[in-house]
Amino acid sequence: QQCGRQASGRLCGNRLCCSQWGYCGSTASYCGAGCQSQCRS
């Protein structure tokens, strides 16, 4: 895991979203339901 509660609350670089599973990305599967940080509003 790269971010979120699975990685001690770490944020993703490049303003990427953190998925519910703790990985960084910019697609809907990262930024949509369950997104932990830097999500699209």
Swiss-Prot record:
Residues 1-41 form the Chitin-binding type-1 domain. It comes from the Eukaryota. The lineage of its organism: Eukaryota, Viridiplantae, Streptophyta, Embryophyta, Tracheophyta. The modification Pyrrolidone carboxylic acid is found at residue 1. It comes from Ipomoea nil. The keyword Ubl conjugation does not apply. SMART domains: ChtBD1. This is Antimicrobial protein PN-AMP1. One of its GO terms (biological process) is killing of cells of another organism. GO terms for molecular function: chitin binding. Its antimicrobial activity is strongly inhibited by divalent cations. Disulfide bonds join 3-18, 12-24, 17-31, 35-39.
